[in-house]
Protein backbone atom coordinates (compact mmCIF):
# COMPACT_ATOMS: atom_id res chain seq x y z
CA UNK A 1 0.00 0.00 0.00
CA UNK A 2 1.41 3.41 -0.99
CA UNK A 3 2.38 5.67 1.87
CA UNK A 4 0.33 8.87 2.11
CA UNK A 5 2.55 11.91 1.67
CA UNK A 6 2.56 14.22 4.66
CA UNK A 7 1.26 17.66 3.67
CA UNK A 8 3.43 20.27 5.34
CA UNK A 9 2.00 23.42 6.87
CA UNK A 10 2.71 26.87 5.49
CA UNK A 11 3.61 28.65 8.73
CA UNK A 12 5.81 31.68 9.39
CA UNK A 13 7.76 32.88 12.39
CA UNK A 14 10.86 32.40 14.50
CA UNK A 15 11.32 29.76 17.17
CA UNK A 16 14.26 30.11 19.53
CA UNK A 17 15.55 26.64 20.34
CA UNK A 18 17.78 25.68 23.25
CA UNK A 19 19.89 23.30 21.17
CA UNK A 20 20.93 20.14 23.01
CA UNK A 21 24.49 18.87 23.10
CA UNK A 22 25.49 16.23 20.56
CA UNK A 23 23.18 17.39 17.79
CA UNK A 24 24.22 19.44 14.76
CA UNK A 25 22.34 22.65 14.01
CA UNK A 26 20.83 21.10 10.89
CA UNK A 27 19.72 17.99 12.78
CA UNK A 28 18.05 20.24 15.34
CA UNK A 29 16.38 22.25 12.59
CA UNK A 30 15.02 19.18 10.82
CA UNK A 31 13.71 17.73 14.08
CA UNK A 32 11.82 20.91 14.96
CA UNK A 33 10.62 21.28 11.38
CA UNK A 34 9.18 17.76 11.58
CA UNK A 35 7.48 18.50 14.91
CA UNK A 36 5.94 21.69 13.49
CA UNK A 37 5.23 19.96 10.16
CA UNK A 38 6.57 23.13 8.55
CA UNK A 39 6.90 23.57 4.80
CA UNK A 40 9.97 25.84 4.79
CA UNK A 41 12.69 26.23 7.42
CA UNK A 42 16.22 27.50 7.97
CA UNK A 43 18.59 28.25 10.85
CA UNK A 44 20.59 31.39 11.50
CA UNK A 45 24.15 30.15 11.85
CA UNK A 46 25.59 26.86 13.02
CA UNK A 47 26.40 25.81 16.55
CA UNK A 48 28.96 23.02 16.95
CA UNK A 49 27.45 19.67 18.04
CA UNK A 50 29.30 20.13 21.36
CA UNK A 51 27.56 23.46 21.98
CA UNK A 52 24.16 24.09 23.52
CA UNK A 53 21.94 27.12 23.78
CA UNK A 54 20.31 29.79 21.65
CA UNK A 55 19.62 28.72 18.06
CA UNK A 56 16.98 30.85 16.30
CA UNK A 57 15.07 28.81 13.72
CA UNK A 58 13.19 30.57 10.93
CA UNK A 59 10.06 29.21 9.27
CA UNK A 60 8.19 30.30 6.17
CA UNK A 61 8.50 34.00 5.37
CA UNK A 62 10.89 34.52 8.30
CA UNK A 63 13.61 32.65 6.36
CA UNK A 64 13.91 35.76 4.15
CA UNK A 65 15.47 37.61 7.09
CA UNK A 66 17.76 34.91 8.50
CA UNK A 67 20.85 36.58 7.00
CA UNK A 68 20.43 39.55 9.30
CA UNK A 69 20.53 37.24 12.32
CA UNK A 70 23.66 35.58 10.92
CA UNK A 71 25.31 39.00 11.04
CA UNK A 72 24.26 39.68 14.65
CA UNK A 73 26.53 39.69 17.69
CA UNK A 74 26.59 36.57 19.85
CA UNK A 75 27.05 35.79 23.54
CA UNK A 76 28.53 32.63 25.09
CA UNK A 77 29.56 30.98 28.32
CA UNK A 78 32.45 28.58 27.85
CA UNK A 79 34.37 26.24 30.10
CA UNK A 80 38.07 26.44 29.27
CA UNK A 81 40.05 23.32 30.17
CA UNK A 82 43.65 24.38 30.67
CA UNK A 83 46.61 22.05 30.20
CA UNK A 84 45.20 20.01 27.31
CA UNK A 85 45.16 20.86 23.59
CA UNK A 86 43.18 18.88 21.02
CA UNK A 87 43.00 18.59 17.24
CA UNK A 88 39.65 20.40 17.08
CA UNK A 89 40.11 22.89 19.91
CA UNK A 90 37.29 21.28 21.88
CA UNK A 91 36.54 18.15 23.90
CA UNK A 92 35.59 16.14 20.80
CA UNK A 93 39.08 16.25 19.28
CA UNK A 94 42.04 13.95 19.77
CA UNK A 95 44.65 14.76 22.37
CA UNK A 96 47.60 16.75 21.02
CA UNK A 97 49.49 17.68 24.18
CA UNK A 98 49.08 17.70 27.95
CA UNK A 99 50.89 20.03 30.33
CA UNK A 100 50.86 20.81 34.03
CA UNK A 101 48.70 23.78 34.97
CA UNK A 102 50.38 26.28 37.27
CA UNK A 103 48.18 29.19 36.20
CA UNK A 104 46.57 31.18 39.00
CA UNK A 105 43.42 33.29 38.92
CA UNK A 106 45.46 36.50 38.74
CA UNK A 107 47.45 35.16 35.77
CA UNK A 108 44.25 34.51 33.87
CA UNK A 109 42.69 37.86 34.81
CA UNK A 110 45.81 39.66 33.58
CA UNK A 111 45.75 37.79 30.24
CA UNK A 112 42.12 38.59 29.38
CA UNK A 113 42.44 42.30 28.44
CA UNK A 114 44.67 41.56 25.44
CA UNK A 115 41.77 39.64 23.87
CA UNK A 116 39.16 42.35 24.37
CA UNK A 117 38.25 44.80 21.63
CA UNK A 118 39.26 44.38 17.98
CA UNK A 119 41.55 41.37 17.56
CA UNK A 120 42.85 39.13 14.77
CA UNK A 121 41.87 35.45 14.68
CA UNK A 122 43.10 32.65 12.44
CA UNK A 123 40.06 30.40 11.81
CA UNK A 124 40.47 26.77 12.92
CA UNK A 125 40.96 23.95 10.43
CA UNK A 126 37.90 22.26 11.90
CA UNK A 127 35.41 24.81 10.59
CA UNK A 128 32.86 25.15 7.79
CA UNK A 129 34.93 27.78 5.99
CA UNK A 130 35.97 26.75 2.49
CA UNK A 131 39.28 26.60 0.65
CA UNK A 132 38.96 26.18 -3.12
CA UNK A 133 35.39 24.99 -2.63
CA UNK A 134 36.27 22.39 0.02
CA UNK A 135 35.15 22.80 3.66
CA UNK A 136 38.20 23.09 5.91
CA UNK A 137 36.93 20.37 8.26
CA UNK A 138 36.95 17.85 5.40
CA UNK A 139 40.55 18.75 4.58
CA UNK A 140 41.44 18.48 8.28
CA UNK A 141 39.90 15.01 8.51
CA UNK A 142 42.07 14.00 5.54
CA UNK A 143 45.13 15.14 7.47
CA UNK A 144 45.66 18.35 5.49
CA UNK A 145 46.54 21.73 6.97
CA UNK A 146 46.15 24.76 4.72
CA UNK A 147 47.07 28.41 5.12
CA UNK A 148 44.25 30.50 6.59
CA UNK A 149 44.17 34.27 6.63
CA UNK A 150 43.61 36.02 9.95
CA UNK A 151 40.26 37.76 10.27
CA UNK A 152 39.29 40.79 12.32
CA UNK A 153 36.68 40.15 15.02
CA UNK A 154 35.48 42.18 17.99
CA UNK A 155 35.25 40.89 21.56
CA UNK A 156 33.02 43.28 23.51
CA UNK A 157 33.04 41.18 26.68
CA UNK A 158 35.50 38.64 28.06
CA UNK A 159 35.06 38.08 31.79
CA UNK A 160 36.07 35.35 34.20
CA UNK A 161 32.97 33.88 35.88
CA UNK A 162 34.62 31.12 37.89
CA UNK A 163 38.09 29.64 38.37
CA UNK A 164 38.46 26.02 39.45
CA UNK A 165 41.79 24.74 38.08
CA UNK A 166 42.29 23.19 35.64
CA UNK A 167 39.03 24.76 34.41
CA UNK A 168 37.78 28.32 34.12
CA UNK A 169 34.38 29.58 33.00
CA UNK A 170 34.34 32.65 30.76
CA UNK A 171 31.58 34.96 29.52
CA UNK A 172 32.12 36.09 25.93
CA UNK A 173 30.25 38.64 23.82
CA UNK A 174 31.55 38.89 20.27
CA UNK A 175 30.94 39.87 16.67
CA UNK A 176 29.91 37.48 13.92
CA UNK A 177 32.65 35.17 12.69
CA UNK A 178 34.31 34.79 16.09
CA UNK A 179 35.49 31.29 16.98
CA UNK A 180 35.36 30.73 20.74
CA UNK A 181 37.52 27.62 20.25
CA UNK A 182 40.25 29.78 18.72
CA UNK A 183 39.86 32.39 21.46
CA UNK A 184 40.34 29.72 24.13
CA UNK A 185 43.28 28.14 22.29
CA UNK A 186 45.00 31.52 21.89
CA UNK A 187 44.39 32.32 25.55
CA UNK A 188 45.87 28.97 26.56
CA UNK A 189 48.93 29.68 24.44
CA UNK A 190 49.46 33.04 26.15
CA UNK A 191 49.14 31.33 29.55
CA UNK A 192 51.77 28.80 28.48
CA UNK A 193 49.73 25.72 29.28
CA UNK A 194 47.46 25.30 26.26
CA UNK A 195 43.68 24.96 26.52
CA UNK A 196 40.56 23.72 24.78
CA UNK A 197 36.80 24.25 25.04
CA UNK A 198 35.31 21.68 27.40
CA UNK A 199 31.78 23.10 27.17
CA UNK A 200 30.10 25.90 25.23
CA UNK A 201 26.68 27.46 25.70
CA UNK A 202 25.33 30.25 23.53
CA UNK A 203 23.46 32.72 25.70
CA UNK A 204 22.61 35.35 23.09
CA UNK A 205 22.09 35.61 19.33
CA UNK A 206 21.23 39.15 18.29
CA UNK A 207 18.10 40.14 20.24
CA UNK A 208 17.35 36.58 21.35
CA UNK A 209 18.41 35.41 24.82
CA UNK A 210 18.49 32.08 26.62
CA UNK A 211 15.38 33.02 28.62
CA UNK A 212 13.37 32.88 25.36
CA UNK A 213 14.74 29.51 24.24
CA UNK A 214 12.57 26.39 24.25
CA UNK A 215 14.08 22.97 24.87
CA UNK A 216 13.56 20.10 22.46
CA UNK A 217 12.04 18.09 25.32
CA UNK A 218 9.37 20.76 25.81
CA UNK A 219 8.57 20.80 22.09
CA UNK A 220 8.28 17.01 22.00
CA UNK A 221 6.01 16.95 25.06
CA UNK A 222 3.68 19.67 23.72
CA UNK A 223 3.63 17.96 20.30
CA UNK A 224 2.68 14.64 21.91
CA UNK A 225 -0.19 16.32 23.73
CA UNK A 226 -1.56 18.55 20.97
CA UNK A 227 0.14 17.86 17.65
CA UNK A 228 1.99 20.35 15.41
CA UNK A 229 -0.58 23.14 15.85
CA UNK A 230 0.06 23.20 19.61
CA UNK A 231 3.63 24.33 18.90
CA UNK A 232 2.51 27.51 17.13
CA UNK A 233 2.42 29.22 20.53
CA UNK A 234 6.24 29.23 20.48
CA UNK A 235 6.51 31.04 17.14
CA UNK A 236 7.53 34.70 17.30
CA UNK A 237 6.69 37.23 14.53
CA UNK A 238 8.81 37.28 11.36
CA UNK A 239 10.45 40.59 12.30
CA UNK A 240 11.37 39.55 15.87
CA UNK A 241 15.04 39.52 14.98
CA UNK A 242 14.87 43.06 13.61
CA UNK A 243 13.18 44.92 16.46
CA UNK A 244 16.29 47.07 16.96
CA UNK A 245 15.79 48.49 13.44
CA UNK A 246 13.81 51.72 12.97
CA UNK A 247 10.23 51.14 11.86
CA UNK A 248 8.31 52.99 9.15
CA UNK A 249 4.54 52.79 8.70
CA UNK A 250 3.33 53.48 5.16
CA UNK A 251 -0.05 54.78 4.08
CA UNK A 252 -2.39 52.34 2.35
CA UNK A 253 -1.60 54.02 -0.98
CA UNK A 254 2.21 53.90 -0.53
CA UNK A 255 2.16 50.33 0.79
CA UNK A 256 0.32 49.16 -2.35
CA UNK A 257 3.05 50.45 -4.67
CA UNK A 258 5.87 49.42 -2.32
CA UNK A 259 4.57 45.84 -2.18
CA UNK A 260 4.64 45.83 -5.99
CA UNK A 261 8.35 46.59 -5.97
CA UNK A 262 8.29 50.35 -6.38
CA UNK A 263 10.30 52.73 -4.15
CA UNK A 264 8.10 55.27 -2.36
CA UNK A 265 8.58 58.55 -0.57
CA UNK A 266 7.88 58.92 3.15
CA UNK A 267 8.69 62.31 4.70
CA UNK A 268 8.93 60.80 8.20
CA UNK A 269 11.56 58.22 7.18
CA UNK A 270 15.21 58.45 8.33
CA UNK A 271 17.73 59.95 5.92
CA UNK A 272 19.60 56.67 5.43
CA UNK A 273 19.79 53.02 6.49
CA UNK A 274 17.56 49.97 6.66
CA UNK A 275 14.01 49.91 7.98
CA UNK A 276 11.28 47.57 9.11
CA UNK A 277 8.25 48.54 7.06
CA UNK A 278 4.60 48.22 8.11
CA UNK A 279 1.38 48.87 6.23
CA UNK A 280 -1.29 51.31 7.45
CA UNK A 281 -2.66 48.65 9.85
CA UNK A 282 0.71 48.08 11.52
CA UNK A 283 1.31 44.71 9.83
CA UNK A 284 4.96 43.94 9.02
CA UNK A 285 5.32 43.79 5.22
CA UNK A 286 9.08 43.65 4.70
CA UNK A 287 12.34 45.54 4.97
CA UNK A 288 13.46 48.53 2.96
CA UNK A 289 16.49 50.72 2.41
CA UNK A 290 16.63 54.49 2.08
CA UNK A 291 18.09 55.32 -1.34
CA UNK A 292 20.27 58.29 -2.26
CA UNK A 293 17.24 60.24 -3.48
CA UNK A 294 15.42 59.70 -0.16
CA UNK A 295 12.93 57.09 -1.32
CA UNK A 296 12.31 53.79 0.46
CA UNK A 297 13.24 50.86 -1.77
CA UNK A 298 11.81 47.40 -1.00
CA UNK A 299 14.52 44.80 -0.34
CA UNK A 300 12.65 41.83 1.17
CA UNK A 301 8.87 41.51 1.11
CA UNK A 302 6.47 39.43 3.16
CA UNK A 303 4.12 37.36 1.04
CA UNK A 304 0.56 38.01 2.19
Swiss-Prot record:
Residues at the active site: 48 (nucleophile)
Reactions the enzyme catalyzes: uridine(55) in tRNA = pseudouridine(55) in tRNA
Molecular function in Gene Ontology: pseudouridine synthase activity; RNA binding; tRNA pseudouridine(55) synthase activity
Record-level GO BP terms: mRNA pseudouridine synthesis; tRNA modification; tRNA pseudouridine synthesis
Record Pfam families: TruB-C_2, TruB_C_2, TruB_N
Enzyme class: isomerase
EC number(s) given by UniProt: 5.4.99.25
Keyword vocabulary terms for this entry: Isomerase, tRNA processing
Entry-linked Gene3D superfamilies: Pseudouridine synthase, PUA domain
InterPro entries given in the database record: PsdUridine_synth_cat_dom_sf, PsdUridine_synth_N, PUA-like_sf, PUA_sf, tRNA_psdUridine_synth_TruB, tRNA_sdUridine_synth_fam1_C, TruB_C
Family as reported in the entry's similarity comment: Belongs to the pseudouridine synthase TruB family. Type 1 subfamily.
Stated role: Responsible for synthesis of pseudouridine from uracil-55 in the psi GC loop of transfer RNAs. Osmoprotectant regulator of PLC.
Protein name per the record: tRNA pseudouridine synthase B
Lineage of the species this protein comes from: Bacteria, Pseudomonadati, Pseudomonadota, Gammaproteobacteria, Pseudomonadales
UniProt gene name: truB
Amino acid sequence: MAQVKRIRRSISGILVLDKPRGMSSNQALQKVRWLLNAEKAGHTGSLDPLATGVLPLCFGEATKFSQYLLDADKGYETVMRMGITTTTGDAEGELLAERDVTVGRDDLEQALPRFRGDIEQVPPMYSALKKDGQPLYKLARAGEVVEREARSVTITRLDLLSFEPPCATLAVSCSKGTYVRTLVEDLGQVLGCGAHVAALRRTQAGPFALAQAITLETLERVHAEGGPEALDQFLMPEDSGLLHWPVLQLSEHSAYYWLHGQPVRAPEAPKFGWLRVQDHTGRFIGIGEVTDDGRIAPRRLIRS
